[in-house]
Amino acid sequence: MYAVVKTGGKQYKVAAGEKLKVEQIPADVGAEITLDQVLAVGAGDQLKVGAPLVSGAAVKATVISHGRHDKVHIFKMRRRKHYQKRQGHRQNYTELRIDSIVA
C-alpha cells in the first residue's frame, strides 16, 4: 500500500516502513505526527484519488531526526563590470519514518 502526501509545499509518494526527508516540521525527535493531506492512496491495481484530498485518509509517521542538507553555492557575476557575488544556502529538513497508512 502506498500514499501520496503533501507537506511543506511538496508531494511525496510513501509506503509503510520507508524513511523520508521533508521540509522542517516543528516536532521533537521521537514524536509521532499525522500527515492528513493525503492526495491519493493505492494498493495493488486499486487507486483512490482525492478531489483534492482523500477523505478519512492519513499517514502516521515518527520523527527520526532533524538536520541540514548539503550547501548549495550561488554565484552571480556580471561580465566586464567587476561584479561578483557569492552566497551559500543550507536547507533544514526533518527525517520521518512512515509507520502506517490509514485509508
From Swiss-Prot:
Keywords: Ribonucleoprotein, Ribosomal protein, RNA-binding, rRNA-binding
SUPFAM superfamilies per record: L21p-like
Protein name according to UniProt: Large ribosomal subunit protein bL21
Function: This protein binds to 23S rRNA in the presence of protein L20.
High-level lineage: Bacteria, Pseudomonadati, Pseudomonadota, Betaproteobacteria, Burkholderiales
Pfam family, any one: Ribosomal_L21p
PANTHER family listed in its UniProt record: 50S RIBOSOMAL PROTEIN L21, LARGE RIBOSOMAL SUBUNIT PROTEIN BL21M
Record-linked InterPro entries: bL21-like, bL21-like_sf, Ribosomal_bL21, Ribosomal_bL21_CS
UniProt xrefs under HAMAP family: Ribosomal_bL21
Family assignment from sequence similarity: Belongs to the bacterial ribosomal protein bL21 family.
NCBIfam families for the chain: L21
GO annotation, biological process: translation
